[in-house]
Amino acid sequence: MSRLFYFGSDSMLEEQRNPYVKLLSVNQALELGLEINSDLLDDNFNQATPEVILFCEDETKFEYPNIFSINKEDYYDDIGTSKQFCTALEWKYSVDTVDVVLKYIQNHLKTAPELELWSVWLGSEELPAYGKRTLCKVSDLTADRLKEFYISESDFQCLTVVG
């Protein structure tokens, strides 16, 4: 099983990529003086091929939130939402990252009536309809509330945040 955090909305969701992570070609990585796996240095491999190596200069910045579009129909499991637009949220809770997530939610709700934040264990036998659902006003949403959501072990949970 793997855990999927994602947002659902009937309004278009913006992507927000981790600015500290870069995808490099082997040549770019060599120019930076990075140690490269010998398989990638093989003569049969085109070292100019873009986006082969995932690079983050500071390992602590790797956990910065990465928010990108997903298609819920691409998942074998029912991921729970009936919302039209979805973005995956890759993150690890910390004092810094929770503020980024909180601001993302607040910004989205400037133009949308509500936003769902889901935590789903893919491969779970529990059905989304029976998962934990809570409603919260954006003015009441805090870092502590998001921390509780993050550490919860519920198979399916949805936090609906309204403006």
PLM regions: where:
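Structured alpha/beta or helical-core interaction and ligand-binding surfaces enriched in interleaved
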Residues: 1-163
